[in-house]
Swiss-Prot record:
GO terms for molecular function: ATP binding. Disulfide bonds: none annotated. PANTHER family: DEPHOSPHO-COA KINASE, UPF0200 PROTEIN MJ1399. Pfam families: AAA_17 (PF13207). HAMAP family: UPF0200. InterPro entries: NTP_hydrolase-rel (IPR022970), P-loop_NTPase (IPR027417). This is UPF0200 protein TK1334. Belongs to the UPF0200 family.
Length: 185
């Protein structure tokens, strides 16, 4: 089984990924693949460079570029695990790449929605190098994600979590969701 986790930046995707990992299931982060590719190209890890590489990869390899780069990692992990989680799928082309590469696998899409203001505050607090510090940067990043096609992936989700309450409430919802998905093994 492949579990694709999607949502806008700062929505709470990593909580879902971490819950699967706590239960012994590995994950592949498409964002990490872009960051690795940025370093391979001799560029410093800045939000500008990561964004440029993300766009350049799609120009060079197609809209599903990052998924193509992840397929072999996912394949290797599936040899040792019943479930592999893929974090950060941003387009239906990427979903299609995984469906095409793994036709025998049950592929489940989990989306997380969090209101924009909450996401902005979380991203500012998170402090990763590519996190926006101004509302304008935040909106620009959101539009970039939407242009990649993330809205289509969210719309096609098998499960949708709304993360607009307390941390404890969301963590309880995540555990419940992971329990439900694992019960289908």
């Amino acid at each position: 089984m492949i579990v694709i986790v999607t949502g806008m930046p700062g929505s709470g995707k990593s909580k879902i990924v971490k819950e699967f990992e706590k239960r012994g299931f590995p994950s592949v982060s498409l964002g990490d693949i872009v960051r690795e590719e940025t370093l391979k190209r001799g560029l410093e890890l800045t939000k500008e460079n990561v964004a440029k590489v993300s766009i350049r990869l799609r120009q060079e390899l197609g809209q599903n570029a990052v998924a193509k780069l992840a397929v072999e990692k996912v394949r290797a992990l599936l040899k040792g695990s019943q479930v592999v989680v893929i974090d950060g799928v941003r387009s239906l082309d990427e979903v299609g790449t995984f469906r095409g590469a793994f036709p025998e696998e049950n592929i489940i899409i989990v989306a997380v929605h969090t209101p924009p203001r909450q996401r902005f505050e979380r991203l500012k607090a998170r402090g990763r190098h590519d996190d926006p510090q101004t509302w304008e940067d935040f909106e620009e990043r959101d539009w970039k994600e939407l242009r990649f096609g993330i809205g289509g992936v969210i719309a096609m989700a098998d499960y949708m979590l709304v993360n607009n309450g307390s941390r404890e409430e969301y963590e309880a919802e995540v555990k419940k969701l992971v329990d439900e998905i694992i019960s289908k093994l």
